[in-house]
From Swiss-Prot:
Quaternary context: Component of the mitochondrial large ribosomal subunit (mt-LSU). Mature N.crassa 74S mitochondrial ribosomes consist of a small (37S) and a large (54S) subunit. The 37S small subunit contains a 16S ribosomal RNA (16S mt-rRNA) and 32 different proteins. The 54S large subunit contains a 23S rRNA (23S mt-rRNA) and 42 different proteins.
Organism: Neurospora crassa (strain ATCC 24698 / 74-OR23-1A / CBS 708.71 / DSM 1257 / FGSC 987)
Record keywords: Mitochondrion, Ribonucleoprotein, Ribosomal protein
Function: Component of the mitochondrial ribosome (mitoribosome), a dedicated translation machinery responsible for the synthesis of mitochondrial genome-encoded proteins, including at least some of the essential transmembrane subunits of the mitochondrial respiratory chain. The mitoribosomes are attached to the mitochondrial inner membrane and translation products are cotranslationally integrated into the membrane.
Full protein name: Large ribosomal subunit protein mL43
Molecular function via GO: structural constituent of ribosome
Length: 138
């Protein structure tokens, strides 16, 4: 019997069965020391990032400079997708909210729902129509 490597750690559809697996596995933080648009990112890296990284030990944080470019946060997910958010001219607290958004995201593409409620079973009562039943007396 041969041993095969896992292609994925977990799927988003079965998360919660057994144990919770955080979908974000890596967070890349790119900044520039020279550009003025990275002022908030530099403040985030110095003040808020150590606490955020300590609170989330299951995520790998990579901080790397990108000279003369706008700062970005890039999340890598266990399903293989990545999401990037440009955080130019943002304050450190706004960048923290964007980092939390990337941490909590599933990594899946946004899906458009045709109906506000999705169900596998149709309604027992059917769809309401003003043309059925007694109607209104005028």
């Amino acid at each position: 019997m041969t041993v095969k490597a896992l292609t994925q750690i977990s799927s988003a559809g079965r998360n919660g069965v057994g144990a919770f697996v955080l979908q974000c596995k890596k967070l890349d933080i790119h900044y520039s020391d020279w550009a003025g648009s990275s002022r908030g990112m530099n403040g985030f890296i110095k003040s808020l990032l150590p606490k955020f990284a300590a609170a989330n030990p299951q995520i790998e944080f990579v901080v790397s400079p990108r000279p003369a470019k706008h700062p970005i946060l890039m999340g890598h997910y266990i399903n293989g997708r990545t999401k990037a958010i440009c955080v130019r001219n943002m304050e450190p607290l706004e960048i923290l909210k964007k980092a939390e958004l990337l941490r909590d995201a599933s990594g899946e593409k946004p899906q458009k729902f045709k109906k506000p409620v999705t169900s596998t079973n149709p309604s027992v009562r059917g769809v309401w129509s003003p043309y059925h039943g007694q109607g209104m007396a005028v």
